[in-house]
Amino acid sequence: MKIYKKSILVCSCTLAIFTLAACGTNQNQTMEKQDKTTIQQDKTDKVNYTGTYSNLNSKESVEDVRKALAAHLDKDSVDTFFNLVNDYNATVGSVGLTGDFSTFTKTEYDVEKITNLWTPKKGDFVGTNCRINSYCLLKNSIEIPNVEKDDSLLFLDNDAIDKGKVFGAEDKDAFDILFSRVKTEATTDVKVHAAKMEQFLSQFKFNENARMLSVVVHDDLDGQSLFIGHVGILVPSEDGYLFVEKLTFEEPYQAIKFATKEDCYKYLDTKYENYTGEGLAKPFIMDNDKWVQS
């Protein structure tokens, strides 16, 4: 098992020290509202999911994904997101990024080559990660309460936001609240941690159609806490569901088409299941404010 320290945890969905960091519904239909009880994931065939993916490195894939996102999110947010996508791909897109959707298998990216293309053009702005991009998409369609924040694990995110002038002070404050560290107990029991995360996220009003799927990790370096180490947005599409994510600061955007939302849960669950350590609970998935049991 991989034992992560604070620097590794914070970099989930960031500087490649830690790779965590990071059907059948019509596009015009709304995604069914989740029950108020915990979401159950089918325990059979856990790793059996299929999909197609794109790094949004073609006009056709961008138009396809834009259409799916625009059906459930405001134009300004979608435009802001694609400005970030286009800037990233224009800078590093020559490093084998896919355009048209193709069969989704395990993806690996040459971070060294990407960095060598990015840094000379962008300097000390490291780019954006999963949390920044997810917030850009959701910020106008969710309600974030004015509650106390703990942004101690967001210093890399906030530095990138400032240096890249991604958004202003008000949005930055809301971002820090949404992705705050959450206090928890010293236990490996995921149920305990999931209840803490559900309680915290219940304060927010989420978009029922553009859903925030989060991978929550447990950390014990500076007290017992929970942190959204990876996050992306799931929307209904013409062929099922579309999941949009930015893997890390260096690694690219991925738009993945799944037949069912359960397939997306399985993708996240299996991709990040080993990011834990001795005495720590395994990562778990949240769909908006509900725990997805695996």
Predicted regions and their residues:
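Bacterial N-terminal signal peptides that target proteins for export
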Residues: 1-11
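Repetitive helical segments and hydrophobic/amphipathic motifs
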Residues: 14-15
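C-terminal motif of bacterial Sec signal peptides marking the signal peptidase cleavage site
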Residues: 18-22
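Cysteine-nucleophile amide-bond enzymes
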Residues: 23-294
